[in-house]
Each structure stands twice: as structure tokens, then as C-alpha cells.
């Protein structure tokens, strides 16, 4: 028999514990879901989908295979969010810094993005729930084939106005602010905008998802506890929740715990 050691042994033990506790978790999940539905659910949830590569590494897989597991998980999590009454979900799929990863990994990532955006355009789930799909970021940095797939998904869902899936790709929070400032500077220069009238409301018109409420809750998986340049303009008063599981292993009970914790917090907005 092959001996399992190190990281893999811990993973096997963790999986064994989860299997043995599955009936208990299911019961707890039902109770927790009832409590969550009794309280106020955030309208907009941001998710930093972290840990795909580490998940793959622990399974002895290639990094891109971890990203595929992560893409599968997104469909489930979106469905859970919508079932709970969340109106908008913004997920961090690819940062501007991620564009510096090895060429082979990026190629696989772009292949996956092209495939999944095309699938979103025709997804029964997306159209049944009437979810508008949008990509936000410096999209010009993506290959043409990926941009075409994005446009296909956006066109196919553009009539939907009540629920949103925003996918942040080639995205950086600082870069978004810089892009907004450049556009504002241009409009001031050509006389379209009076600089004395610029306020937060004005600025919102120039950021990527300024038409939506700020995310009330931001969840990050994998155990890392930082925003990593995600939604910087919007997150001034967001509640942050960090969970110590890799994104492909994120469960409905983890989402319920995050929202339940959100409901328990007192949001004072600096007052």
C-alpha cells in the first residue's frame, strides 16, 4: 500500500472527517439556512476565489486543473447566493498581477475563460434566473478570443436588470481608480465636466460597477486575510469574511456562515 504523507495525509484526514460528519453538517446547514433567511441578506456579495492552485498542488494536479475545479464551483455558489436573495455577485477571477504567470498556465486559463463565458451565454441556470453577466477590468489585455466570448455572454444577458454576475478579469482595484481618474481628467479637459462639481456620486459614474450598490460582504477563501487589490473603491464599509478552505472546496455551509456572521455585525459606517 502506498504510504500517504505530509500535506496529502492531512488532506485525506480532512476529507475523512468531512465524510463522517456529513449527516451532521446537513442538519446544521438546514438550521443555519433558516436563520439566514430570517435576517437581512446582503444585496451585493464580493468573492475572492482564492486557492485553486494550492488545491491542485495538494492533489498532484497541474495548476490549470485547479482553476477548472474553481470554475465549476462558481456556478454552484452563484445559485446558492441567488437562492438566499443576493442580487449581485462580483468574483475576482484574474488580477492584473496574475497576467505575469507562466505562459502555459495563462494559455490554459484563457482557454477556460473562453469556454466558460461561451457557456454562460447559453446557460439554462443563467437564463432561468435572469442573471446579467458582465466582465470588468482592463479587458483589452485579454486575448481577442476571450473578449469575443465575453461579449457573447454580455449580449445574451443584457436584458436582465435585477440580478448580476460580475466577473473581474485582468482587474486591479488601483488600476480601476486610475482608469476612472483618466476619464474624469479627459472630460474636464474637453469641457464636459466642471471640476468643482466632482464628488463621490460623480466618481461612481466612471468606475466599472458604479451602477450597483457597494458590496456589503466580501468573502475570501484559502485562509489569506487581505483584499489583494479587489474592489478598493467600493469596499470602504464592506464587511470582510475570511474562510480557511480553498475555493474549489467552498461549501454552502461556508456561505451560510459568512452571511450569518454579516447579519450579527453592527454596521456603523463610521458613525
Curated annotation (Swiss-Prot):
This is Tritrans,polycis-undecaprenyl-diphosphate synthase (geranylgeranyl-diphosphate specific). Disulfide bonds: none annotated. The keyword Iron-sulfur does not apply. The active site is at 50, 98 (proton acceptor). It comes from Methanopyrus kandleri (strain AV19 / DSM 6324 / JCM 9639 / NBRC 100938). Homodimer. The keyword Magnesium applies. PANTHER family: DEHYDRODOLICHYL DIPHOSPHATE SYNTHASE COMPLEX SUBUNIT DHDDS, DEHYDRODOLICHYL DIPHOSPHATE SYNTHASE FAMILY MEMBER. Binds 2 magnesium ions per subunit. Its cofactor is Mg(2+). Substrate binds at residues 51-55, 67, 95-97, 101, 220, 226-228. Mg(2+) binds at residues 50, 239.
Amino acid at each position: 500500500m502506498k504510504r500517504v504523507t505530509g500535506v496529502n495525509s492531512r488532506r485525506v484526514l480532512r476529507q475523512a472527517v468531512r465524510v463522517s460528519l456529513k449527516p451532521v453538517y446537513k442538519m446544521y446547514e438546514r438550521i443555519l439556512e433558516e436563520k439566514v433567511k430570517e435576517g437581512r441578506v446582503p444585496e451585493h456579495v464580493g468573492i475572492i476565489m482564492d486557492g485553486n492552485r494550492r488545491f491542485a498542488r495538494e492533489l498532484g494536479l497541474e495548476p490549470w486543473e485547479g482553476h477548472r475545479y474553481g470554475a465549476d464551483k462558481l456556478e454552484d455558489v452563484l445559485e446558492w447566493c441567488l437562492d438566499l436573495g443576493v442580487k449581485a455577485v462580483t468574483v475576482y477571477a484574474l488580477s492584473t498581477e496574475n497576467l505575469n504567470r507562466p505562459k502555459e498556465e495563462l494559455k490554459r486559463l484563457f482557454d477556460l475563460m473562453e469556454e466558460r463565458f461561451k457557456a454562460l451565454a447559453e446557460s439554462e441556470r443563467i437564463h432561468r434566473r435572469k442573471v446579467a453577466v458582465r466582465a470588468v477590468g482592463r479587458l483589452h489585455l485579454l486575448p481577442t478570443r476571450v473578449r469575443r466570448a465575453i461579449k457573447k455572454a454580455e449580449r445574451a444577458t443584457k436584458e436582465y436588470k435585477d440580478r448580476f454576475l460580475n466577473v473581474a478579469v485582468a482587474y486591479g482595484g488601483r488600476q480601476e481608480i486610475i482608469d476612472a481618474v483618466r476619464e474624469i481628467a479627459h472630460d474636464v479637459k474637453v469641457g464636459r465636466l466642471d471640476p468643482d462639481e466632482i464628488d463621490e456620486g460623480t466618481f461612481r459614474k466612471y468606475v466599472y460597477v458604479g451602477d450597483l450598490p457597494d458590496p456589503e460582504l466580501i468573502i475570501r477563501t484559502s485562509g489569506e486575510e487581505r483584499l489583494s487589490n479587489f474592489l478598493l473603491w467600493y469596499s470602504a464599509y464592506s464587511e470582510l469574511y475570511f474562510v480557511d478552505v480553498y475555493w474549489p472546496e467552498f461549501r454552502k455551509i461556508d456561505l451560510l456562515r459568512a452571511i450569518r456572521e454579516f447579519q450579527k455585525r453592527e454596521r456603523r459606517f463610521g458613525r
